């Protein structure tokens, strides 16, 4: 849809030159920081020596994942030099990876339908107690639930993210970590920090779960 807007100069949403900051995890960090939301330290994967230097700074474990990826696909939790070597042996050569310090946190999302002026028409969120990365890598069961009342801190960072990224006329799914322990440079236990943005609804049956949880119809809200 961004290409169509660009080709026909439609100004109701993102154009093609906006795509990098909403698709690449490394590009998102600038706009989270602009919104005053903490982000994990990162390193763009280059050489083994370059990654070792980054790990020396932040310590094990670290996470390596495609800079442009979804659903924790081909994501590695690296806890030792041996696992780092395994990552370099198994990573896709044509894919750009980002490496980040590991964060002990619970995923809290901000899900909202944004109008043409960048104002939320509907807001909710979900909590994922189990790490999506672990679910994918360990083939575990997936578990998450829709919150009845969106926490004030998630609402605050969600709205700040809307403004920073310049979101209009979208159904969005923004992900944040709620820290499970104090983390130097990121915050205290219970604080909220950035994970990633998705300029689309949360996947699977989540829109239907939202409808049941809130006795609403997000499809109708979006259509209106």
Each language-model region and where it sits:
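ATP-binding N-terminal substructure of ATP-dependent carboxylate-amine bond-forming enzymes
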Residues: 1-17, 49
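Short glycine-/acidic-enriched loop or helix-start segments at secondary-structure transitions
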Residues: 1-3, 73-74, 109, 206
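Short polybasic/polar patches that bind polyanions
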Residues: 6, 33, 56, 163, ...
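A short, flexible beta-alpha/helix-coil linker loop
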Residues: 11, 68-71, 200-203
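Short, acidic/turn-prone active-site loops that include or flank metal/cofactor-
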Residues: 16-21, 127-128
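Active-site nucleotide/adenylate-binding loops and adjacent lid/helix of ATP-dependent enzymes
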Residues: 21-105, 115-119, 141-156
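ATP-dependent carboxylate/phosphate-activation module, predominantly the ATP-grasp catalytic core
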Residues: 101-167, 171, 178-182, 186-189, ...
């Amino acid at each position: 849809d961004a290409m169509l807007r660009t080709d026909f100069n439609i100004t109701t949403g993102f154009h093609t030159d906006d795509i990098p900051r909403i698709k690449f995890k490394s590009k998102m960090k600038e706009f989270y920081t602009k919104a005053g939301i903490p982000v994990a330290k990162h390193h763009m994967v280059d050489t083994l020596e370059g990654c070792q230097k980054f790990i020396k700074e932040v310590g094990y474990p670290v996470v390596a994942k495609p800079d442009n990826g979804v659903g924790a696909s081909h994501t590695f939790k690296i806890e030792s030099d041996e696992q780092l070597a395994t990552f370099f042996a198994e990573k896709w050569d044509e894919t750009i990876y980002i490496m980040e310090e590991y964060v002990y946190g619970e995923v809290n999302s901000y899900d909202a339908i944004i109008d043409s002026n960048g104002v939320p028409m509907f807001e909710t969120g979900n909590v994922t107690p189990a790490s999506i990365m672990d679910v994918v890598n360990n083939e575990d069961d997936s578990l998450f639930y829709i919150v009845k009342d969106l926490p004030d801190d998630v609402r605050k960072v969600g709205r700040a993210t809307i403004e920073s990224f310049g979101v209009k006329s979208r159904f969005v799914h923004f992900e944040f970590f709620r820290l499970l322990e104090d983390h130097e440079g990121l915050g205290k236990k219970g604080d909220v920090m950035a994970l990633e943005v998705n300029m689309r609804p949360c996947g699977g049956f989540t829109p239907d779960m939202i409808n049941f949880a809130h006795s609403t119809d997000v499809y109708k809200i979006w259509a209106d």
